[in-house]
From Swiss-Prot:
The keyword rRNA-binding does not apply. GO terms for molecular function: proton-transporting ATP synthase activity, rotational mechanism; proton-transporting ATPase activity, rotational mechanism. GO terms for cellular component: plasma membrane; proton-transporting ATP synthase complex. It is a single-pass membrane protein. Belongs to the ATPase B chain family. This is ATP synthase subunit b. It comes from the Bacteria.
Length: 198
């Protein structure tokens, strides 16, 4: 015999075959309903406000956290925009400084080049003047020496001693002029004869 058959047999022997097991007695139903009502009233009176308060606090914390997060995000976005603006400004400033430096560098190079050209021109001018002065001095010295040598030679060749300084100077000038003319290629003729002095 199975267990379910044994239970059915015990139930039928109890003698309460008229009663429905699913419908409780009225007294139990009233007491159960009253207890449930008290439990619901206690829940709405004590527990529900605490739950609502906790729920409100949690909602407030969540919304406050969201608001703080949004504020922090806005602040971060503003800082990012400010950083980008400063970075753009710094790049523009760096480009301007670089361009100014290039311009200044070119100006300095041009100034140095112009200054060097002026110095070169001045040095060349001084050198030319010095060369001209040295040449004039050397030419004068050579003329004197050549004149003395020419007079000595003329005196030895002619056998006549030129005593006068004016005559010596005229003879030297004539001789040097003749040498200059032949050196310049004025002609291929022989130098003019030196005049006899008296």
């Amino acid at each position: 015999m199975s267990a379910s058959a044994a239970i059915l047999l015990a139930a039928s022997e109890s003698g309460h075959s008229d009663e429905n097991v699913l419908i409780p007695p009225l007294s139990e139903l009233l007491i159960g309903t009253l207890a449930f009502g008290l439990l619901v009233a206690f829940f709405f009176w004590k527990i529900r406000p605490q739950i609502a308060r906790t729920y409100a606090q949690r909602t407030e914390r969540i919304e406050g956290g969201i608001a703080r997060a949004e504020a922090a995000q806005r602040e971060a976005q503003a800082l990012l925009e400010q950083y980008r603006a400063q970075l753009t400004e710094a790049r523009a400033e760096a480009a301007r400084i670089r361009d100014d430096a290039h311009t200044e560098g070119r100006q300095i190079v041009e100034e140095l080049r112009a200054s060097a050209q002026r110095e070169i021109a001045e040095i060349k001018e001084r050198a030319d003047a010095q060369l001209a002065a040295d040449r004039a001095q050397i030419v004068a010295q050579v003329r004197r020496e050549v004149g003395v040598i020419a007079i000595d030679l003329a005196s030895k060749i002619v056998g006549y001693q030129v005593e006068s300084t004016a005559t010596q100077a005229r003879l030297v000038d004539d001789f040097i002029a003749a040498l200059d003319n032949s050196a310049e290629g004025a002609g291929s003729s022989t130098p003019a004869p030196v005049g006899s002095g008296g």
